[in-house]
Amino acid sequence: MTQVTIGENEGIESALRRFKRQVSKAGILRDLRNHRHFETNLEKRKRKAVAMRRNRRKSMA
């Protein structure tokens, strides 16, 4: 769980920026998007195969 403690002289904007940064580093939103819908094993394999092809093309270019 991501927590941010606010200092005495710290503004809410800077605390919110730190919170957003921690959430993005932890990959919480990406994980939430991946688990939004159930994905069968076949769908996972297809998605990973497409990603591998895309990465291979990108590395060749």
UniProtKB/Swiss-Prot annotation:
One of its GO terms (cellular component) is ribosome. InterPro entries: Ribosomal_bS21, Ribosomal_bS21_CS, Ribosomal_bS21_sf. Keywords: Ribonucleoprotein, Ribosomal protein. One of its GO terms (biological process) is translation. It comes from the Bacteria. It holds the Pfam family Ribosomal_S21. GO terms for molecular function: structural constituent of ribosome. Belongs to the bacterial ribosomal protein bS21 family. This is Small ribosomal subunit protein bS21. It comes from Synechococcus sp. (strain JA-3-3Ab) (Cyanobacteria bacterium Yellowstone A-Prime). The gene is rpsU.
